[in-house]
Amino acid sequence: AAAAVAAAAKAAAAMASSGVGVGDDRDGLLRVSGDGLELTSSAANAWAGGRAALGVSGGGCYHFELLQLSPGICRAGWSGLAAKLALGTDRQGFGFGGTGKKSFGNSFDSYGEPYGEGDILGVSLDYRDGSISYHKNGVPLGVAFTVPPPLLRQPLFPAVSLKGCSVRLNLAGPFAAAPAGALPP
């Protein structure tokens, strides 16, 4: 347990990097730090979502990470500008939640394994093959989604939905684990 706490503290220090985080594209229940990288749900029983201010498009692979700072449920992934902020509840956003479920189009399917406080979640979008995949504490969980081609023709944004927890985003690197050649969003 002490090693996990030390690793989480080291990861939090590494994630203190600058970068463009979440701005105004968020629910009223989502509190955002001054640098836009620390996000907190202000309600224990309601989802609060937000999208990063900058998206990605075109070829290549993009990756971001988050450290879950407190108990609660986090869902992280990628979304288009037209997506609901409740990530994965429409056909414009893709999420993977701490309950071990991936979501797209309001369909929740088992994937990977649960995660929570102290875990680092890596989130990758590869435009070369249209895939979204995840890492938990540096361990690849495999491909979660194949993005429909029409969505690959628009910018996609790092996105989170939180219920009763806080996370720290790392949108600039260095990353704990990322696919070879992955770039920050």
Q: Model-derived features: where do they sit?
A:
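PRY/SPRY (B30.2) beta-sandwich protein-interaction domains
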Residues: 1-185
